């Protein structure tokens, strides 16, 4: 009896990390880190570097969605158990600094540059006290995955440059558009003007106290198989998505970019590639409230992009299970869809919806599951 008790104690000591409960992801539930604290990494993304996953996201306070801490980082070997690695990019107390404490810093994503050996972080930035008027990107770099990241700059995208997918005739037509003729929004004429480049032209140059360049709000990053990287963001007052190529060191734009679904009101882009085809899941623009997910595909990341039906299936699919897309994580030959259930009244209590992506009839499907384990899908 004593021997059996000793064996039982030994099993309890060595096997907890293999328990079914510990290896289960429960979408929408509290997800605790190694300290027993709900993971605070919202609107973020995950990379796999040398066999370790690193999750970066917005640190949310209890009462405000403004950035009071910065971008946090967690690490994991199995996608379930996460270790708090600290603040990868802290906000600063210097008055007037771009990332001053109290700014809006959202949707941080990190990619690794094989040539420079640096980790590059991009995020959506709004200056303190300016609401959502600035619509900037921010970029920072680090020599290690956990940071600290060094802030480089913020700004708007590709000032003075037309999209590469616009013909000369389309550019000439857009150049004739006058915002003064479209003061009333949401009319058929205004919508047509947006599609034709009304806001695109407006933001080509500095105006109304704003710097030149395209607006950049909800965003993600994508590194292609040829190691070229792209910045995908919601622009033109959240009415049109842009896909912009990054320089070889991933810290700036080359000037080459395209528009996706002009006037379609898409945000929260999450992109992945399977069997040579690019897929992008987005959401509509309904503030903090969830809506039906959208999906697009393309044979080239620079388009053209084709829209498909909502990929979500199951209870709550019509509102993306109460969440909003933030990232698609490649894991081996599969993919994990990541979304956030926002709680603006209690931001730090926002929840995560992670679900495996399946393919049916050639189309991605995100099916609701109360719980699932990465192992059952072959994720390692």
Locate the predicted segments by residue.
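Bacterial Sec-dependent N-terminal signal peptides
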Residues: 1-21
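Carbohydrate-active catalytic/glycan-binding domains of CAZyme proteins
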Residues: 18-380
């Amino acid at each position: 009896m004593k021997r059996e008790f000793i064996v039982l104690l030994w099993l309890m000591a060595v096997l907890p990390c293999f328990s079914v409960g510990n290896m289960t992801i429960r979408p929408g539930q509290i997800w605790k880190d190694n300290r027993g604290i709900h993971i605070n990494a919202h609107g973020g993304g995950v990379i796999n570097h040398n066999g370790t996953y690193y999750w970066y996201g917005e640190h949310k306070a209890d009462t405000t969605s403004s950035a009071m801490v910065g971008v946090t980082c967690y690490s994991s070997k199995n996608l379930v158990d996460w270790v708090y690695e600290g603040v990868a990019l802290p906000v600063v107390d210097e008055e007037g600094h771009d990332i001053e404490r109290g700014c809006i810093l959202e949707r941080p994503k990190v990619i690794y540059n094989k040539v420079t050996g640096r980790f590059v972080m991009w995020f959506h930035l709004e200056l303190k006290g300016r609401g959502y008027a600035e619509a900037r990107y921010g970029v920072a770099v680090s020599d290690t995955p956990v940071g600290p990241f060094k802030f480089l700059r913020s700004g708007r995208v590709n000032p003075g440059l037309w999209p590469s997918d616009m013909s000369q005739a389309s550019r000439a037509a857009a150049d004739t558009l006058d915002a003064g003729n479209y003061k009333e929004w949401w009319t058929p004429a205004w919508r047509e003007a947006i599609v034709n480049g009304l806001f695109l032209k407006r933001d080509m140059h500095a105006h109304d106290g704003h710097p030149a360049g395209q607006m950049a709000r909800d965003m993600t990053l994508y590194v292609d198989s040829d190691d070229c990287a792209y910045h995908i963001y919601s622009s033109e007052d959240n009415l049109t998505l842009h896909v912009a190529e990054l320089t070889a060191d991933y810290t700036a734009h080359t000037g080459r970019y395209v528009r996706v679904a002009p006037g379609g009101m898409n945000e929260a882009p999450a992109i992945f590639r399977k069997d040579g085809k690019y897929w992008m899941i987005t959401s509509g623009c309904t503030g903090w409230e969830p809506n039906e997910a959208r999906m697009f595909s393309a044979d080239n990341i620079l388009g053209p992009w084709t829209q498909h039906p909502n990929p979500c299936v199951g209870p709550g699919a019509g509102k993306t299970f109460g969440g909003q897309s933030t990232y698609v994580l490649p894991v081996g030959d599969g993919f994990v869809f990541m979304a956030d259930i926002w709680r603006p009244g209690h931001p730090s209590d926002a929840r995560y919806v992670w679900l495996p992506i399946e393919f049916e009839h050639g189309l991605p499907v995100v099916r609701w599951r109360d719980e699932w384990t990465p192992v059952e899908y072959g994720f390692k």
